[in-house]
């Protein structure tokens, strides 16, 4: 699991991303969700989502009052699925921030939020590590831990690679 946290200054919003989350990471992620106020039905839904340990899953939970969000992107079966999960969860995050700030969901500013978050995510994958994680993948092939010589890259879905 990879954890990234950043602050969106224009909205005074703290975002924590968890990438490559598997059932093994379950308690750490659930604890963070609980800390920021995820309770009741939302907590049960998150519990079931993360605890399944399946590929190509994600979730976004936001504490509107505390101006903070937790975004979870699970293991991915392919590079395309990884990109799909990332863009899907980034969209949820952007909508939450927009709703909290009474922004027009069809307006340009929501797209700027998407763009800023995407840049931050990109930095985590490229600049934030000494190893270029994306260079090891063939976009048409399932991701595999075996394709990475130092095992620092995205391992993909363990069920798909065994």
For each feature predicted by the language model, list its residue ranges.
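Post-HExxH zinc-binding segment in Zn-dependent metallohydrolases
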Residues: 104-135
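Long, well-structured alpha-helical subdomains associated
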Residues: 124-149, 154-162
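Membrane-embedded glycan transfer/ligation machinery
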Residues: 80, 84, 112
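Short helix/strand-bridging catalytic loops that position acidic/His residues to coordinate divalent metals
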Residues: 96-104
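Generic recognition of cysteine residues
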Residues: 38, 54-55, 111, 148, ...
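Active-site recognition of the HExxH zinc-binding catalytic motif
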Residues: 84-96
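Active-site scaffold of zinc-dependent metalloenzymes
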Residues: 36-80, 93
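Non-catalytic terminal regions of proteins
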Residues: 1-52
């Amino acid at each position: 699991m990879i954890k990234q946290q950043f602050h969106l200054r224009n909205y005074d919003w703290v975002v924590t991303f968890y990438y490559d989350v598997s059932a093994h990471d379950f308690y750490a992620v659930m604890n963070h969700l609980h800390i920021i106020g995820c309770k009741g039905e939302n907590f049960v839904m998150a519990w079931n989502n993360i605890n399944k340990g399946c590929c190509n899953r994600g979730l976004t939970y936001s504490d509107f009052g505390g101006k903070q969000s937790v975004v979870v992107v699970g293991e991915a079966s392919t590079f395309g699925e990884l990109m799909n999960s990332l863009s899907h969860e980034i969209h949820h995050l952007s909508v939450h921030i927009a709703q909290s700030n009474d922004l027009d969901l069809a307006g340009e500013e929501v797209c700027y939020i998407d763009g800023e978050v995407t840049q931050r995510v990109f930095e985590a994958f490229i600049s934030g590590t000494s190893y270029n994680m994306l260079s090891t993948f063939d976009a048409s092939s399932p991701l595999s831990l075996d394709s990475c010589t130092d095992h620092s890259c995205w391992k993909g879905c363990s069920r798909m690679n065994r």
